[in-house]
Design a protein with these regions (language model features):
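Electron-transfer interface patches adjacent to heme c in soluble/periplasmic c-type cytochromes
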Residues: 2-14
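Acidic, Gly/Ser/Thr-rich repeat motifs that build Ca2+-stabilized beta-propeller blades
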Residues: 12-13, 20-189, 237-240, 245-253, ...
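Blade/loop signatures of beta-propeller domains
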Residues: 28-47, 147-148, 208-220, 273-293, ...
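Beta-propeller fold detector
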Residues: 49-52, 87-94, 149-156, 209-217, ...
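Beta-propeller blade signature
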Residues: 135-146, 195-208, 262-264
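Repeat-solenoid scaffold signature
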Residues: 223-262
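Conserved blade-ending motifs and adjacent loop-strand segments that build the rim/top face
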Residues: 232, 344-365
Length: 387
């Protein structure tokens, strides 16, 4: 997580870093590639296999039934790959606000995609009715001749804001077809406890965008009916456990205090009233790490590792990791494995050190783990090495 994301654009920060680097007399390494040797972990050996190169901040990743891969680049392109080769840039993608941390974000197929053809994706968009600012939006569409058709805007975060950070927004489905997604607080801080806005919340919709009748705040006057939980800073991972149906969220803290949360309906997860982190300038955000009526994280990290992307391992290919959570790290360029037992963390392991700035982690239908990397942008598959 970048400490000056509300002051400098991402490109300005890259340019500043490059200027400092060259002033120190260091030579740029433009040929960097993640090592493709064998990585030895506690339980097994892994060989990274590069599947796609040449991407520009690959954010979302989805697998079509025919084996093709859809990749969202943050700048606003949705790409279709077959066996690692680009075969089409998808047409009809809505205009996105690709500044700071915004852009074209996650992508997810409906659980019954084979029968209904719905594709869901999130992005930082412009208000449909016009006006200042931009918001986290969720749309669904169908794919015909590599063009998005039958587009339906399901969610548009309100009110729109002009900040360029903390958009969220990962997508996941439960077994009943409910769509969950997290929306960042966009710098609103204490306003995340206000149920009349969408910021700093996990939301739940039916697959057609309607509100489920059993959402926790459907009968609360003035509340946004889609809210499932609140008190979140910037959710960057969201996944339903394939083992017990529980909902898990990874969250960027400030300077310290990244979290892994077990999400339950109607619960307040505390930001910014409780936190294990401090502000980037060293100032205290809150002296408290716990308060009555606010949930504690299942685990947290100090210093922050900037979790991004998260998946459960089913064990099809990695039997010794079955039931574990894998989380990407933007800051430390590695993968974090979290072992759970009865809803509690019993072990953590850092994997694939220095492999690259990790944006997303997904398990494919055939059980392989895929991760997307930035700078350079690529997608790699983790192949278990048999002894």
């Amino acid at each position: 997580m970048l400490g000056y994301a509300d002051t400098l654009s991402e490109q300005e920060m890259k340019n500043l870093a490059r200027f400092i680097y060259l002033k120190l007399g260091l030579k740029e390494d433009v040929s960097y590639r993640p090592a493709e040797g064998i990585y030895v972990t506690e339980d097994l050996k892994i060989k990274p296999d590069t599947v796609i190169r040449g991407l520009n901040v690959p954010w979302g990743l989805a697998f079509l039934p025919d084996g093709d891969m859809l990749v969202n680049e943050r700048e606003g392109r949705m790409l279709r790959y077959r066996n690692g080769v680009l075969i089409a840039e998808i047409k009809g993608v809505p205009k996105v606000h690709a500044e700071g941390q915004g852009g074209l974000l996650d992508i997810r197929l409906h659980p019954d995609y084979r029968s209904n053809g719905w594709i869901y994706f999130s992005y930082s968009g412009f208000p449909e009715k016009g006006g200042e600012g931009w918001n986290t939006s969720v749309m669904r569409a169908k794919l015909k001749d590599n063009t998005l058709v039958e587009k339906q805007l399901l969610f548009e975060g309100t009110p729109p804001l002009t900040t360029n950070f903390h958009f969220g927004c990962k997508l996941t489905f439960d077994t009943k077809g409910h769509l969950f997604f997290g929306v960042g607080e966009r710098g609103t801080m204490k306003k995340v406890a206000d149920l009349s806005n969408d910021w700093g919340k996990v939301h739940r919709l039916n697959d057609d965008g309607s509100i489920p009748h059993d959402n926790p705040y459907v009968n609360t006057p003035g509340a946004r009916k889609s809210i499932w939980s609140y008190g979140h800073r910037n959710p960057q991972g969201l996944v339903i456990s394939p083992f017990d149906g529980t909902l898990w969220e990874s969250e960027h803290g400030p300077k310290g205090g990244d979290e892994l949360n077990l999400i339950e309906p109607g619960k307040n997860y505390g930001w910014p009233f409780i936190t294990f982190g401090i502000n980037y300038d060293g100032k205290i955000i809150s002296p408290d790490t716990a308060m009555v009526g606010m949930e504690q994280p299942v685990t947290y990290w100090v210093p922050s590792f900037a979790p991004c992307g998260m998946t459960f391992v089913t064990g099809k290919r990695y039997k010794s990791w079955e039931g574990d959570i894998l989380m990407g790290s933007l800051r430390f360029h590695n993968l974090v494995r979290v072992k759970l037992k009865d809803g509690k963390v019993i072990h953590r392991e850092v994997l694939l050190n220095n492999i690259g700035r990790m944006r997303n982690v997904e398990e494919s239908p055939d059980g392989f783990i895929y991760v997307s990397l930035e700078e350079p942008g690529m997608i790699i598959r983790l192949v278990p090495v048999q002894e």
